[in-house]
Amino acid sequence: MKRDFNEFVKFIKNKKTAVVGMGISNRPLIHFLSKLGAEITAFDRKTKEELGDEVINEFSSENVKFELGENYLSALKGFDVVFKTPSMRIDSEALVKAKQEGAYITSEMEEFIKYCPAKIFGVTGSDGKTTTTTLIYNMLKEEGYKTWVGGNIGTPLFSKIKEVSTKDKVVLELSSFQLMTIDVSPEVAVVTNLSPNHLDIHKNMEEYINAKKNIFTHQSKGNVLIINRDNEITNNMESEALGDLLKFSRNEKVKNGAYYNKQDGNIYLFENKICNKDDIKIKGMDNVKNFMAAFCAVSKDVSKESMIKVAMNFAGVEHRREFVRELDGVKYYNDSIASSPTRTISGLNAYERPVILIAGGYDKHIPFEPLAEKGYDKIKVLILMGATKNKIKETFDKVICEKNIKLPIILSDNLEEAVCEAKKVATNGDIVTLSPACASFDSFPNFEVRGNKFKEIVNNLK
């Protein structure tokens, strides 16, 4: 049951409140909590110089205190409330001590879900989260609802909660970090798929899966859980559903949910045809799955006509198999979002011919064997870069040896060199794609910056 936001207003007033992290989502939160009368101290690992005067001056009129620099968490003592940044583990020494002192530990997203008056659609998974979230958002908007999007994408929503009405709809993309500590779940929960990911942060795969499960473990009767029938991990969640259960599948007929019929190419929802695969503007079977998940999610709120209109007109999300340009008969695609092997495999499967693949980046301690075993025959030339380039090469070398095949592998020092190598080996009709199978943090702040740099390099090729 939704809680009255006035409860929070009364609760937070005059409370000594720590906000850990001064990133994009927490800055509006600091302003918001300050206006509600909280006594704010902002914490960040960056120094005052690294944050810049613009950020510090942003809070000059609100009496916000700062604890900055390498040992910033040593001052996390004596607070009534602590808003943690999503990537901060709840079992970190500083948070454990704060909790022992009696502090209420929470996050911007947890409080939003708790007090949001509108119906919330939550989406999580290893791959396909952003596209599925955006599809649900577009379908609800097409139907005429005032719709908000947040979480990993869009804007921080807790600071806008007073503007959200009971008639609105809210769509949230939720990461394992955001879900790890929440004790509330959205009314509609979608789990697109699950595979090894973020094992540099999570202790093991079990912890990662359990974090994802939080999207539905606090649901109640009348709520909806939507899972991928074709993914072993998500399909095993069936017995844990607390409300209604819907499934989607590209491999078999599903009565209670959505499925793809290979014979006629149609997508069905509750055994009624919605559209044909070829009606969908963005190509690839991974996008068919994203659409099926979205159809299930909005099935009680959106007409078939609105679903079809979005399918025919939605052009995709930036950095997701985004066409950049064609030069000398070679097409270049930006798939920088592909920060896991499974995501890269999905990308490779979307092309009709083997591609020149640029991969590699930050090491999340996940295995690359699936990429090598399932992707080798879809790659014409493999160009590797970043911290994982040797690790990926070793994995592919084993498969090349076992299968007695030829697959040229080129090692590059950086993205610019990788693109230049791709241009050298590409011939008329080839496809070059940046689909790293890794996070970007060894060279770039995030996948968007990496993708934009790739586009800049490609657009400057002559």
Swiss-Prot record:
What are the GO MF terms of this UniProt record? ATP binding; UDP-N-acetylmuramoylalanine-D-glutamate ligase activity
Q: In which pathway does it act?
A: Cell wall biogenesis; peptidoglycan biosynthesis
EC number(s) for this protein?
6.3.2.9
Reaction(s) catalysed (UniProt annotation)? UDP-N-acetyl-alpha-D-muramoyl-L-alanine + D-glutamate + ATP = UDP-N-acetyl-alpha-D-muramoyl-L-alanyl-D-glutamate + ADP + phosphate + H(+)
InterPro entries per the record? Answer: Mur-like_cat_sf, Mur_ligase_C, Mur_ligase_C_dom_sf, Mur_ligase_cen, MurD
- Give a GO cellular-component term: cytoplasm
Residues that coordinate or bind ATP:
G125, S126, D127, G128, K129, T130, T131
**Localisation per UniProt entry:** Cytoplasm
What keywords is this UniProt entry annotated with?
ATP-binding, Cell cycle, Cell division, Cell shape, Cell wall biogenesis/degradation, Cytoplasm, Ligase, Nucleotide-binding, Peptidoglycan synthesis
Keyword Lipoprotein among UniProt keywords: no
* A biological process from GO: cell division
Q: What class of enzyme is it?
A: ligase
Record-stated family: Belongs to the MurCDEF family.
What is the protein's known function? Cell wall formation. Catalyzes the addition of glutamate to the nucleotide precursor UDP-N-acetylmuramoyl-L-alanine (UMA).
Name assigned to this protein: UDP-N-acetylmuramoylalanine--D-glutamate ligase
**Species annotation:** Clostridium acetobutylicum (strain ATCC 824 / DSM 792 / JCM 1419 / IAM 19013 / LMG 5710 / NBRC 13948 / NRRL B-527 / VKM B-1787 / 2291 / W)
Classification lineage: Bacteria, Bacillati, Bacillota, Clostridia, Eubacteriales
* Gene it is expressed from: murD
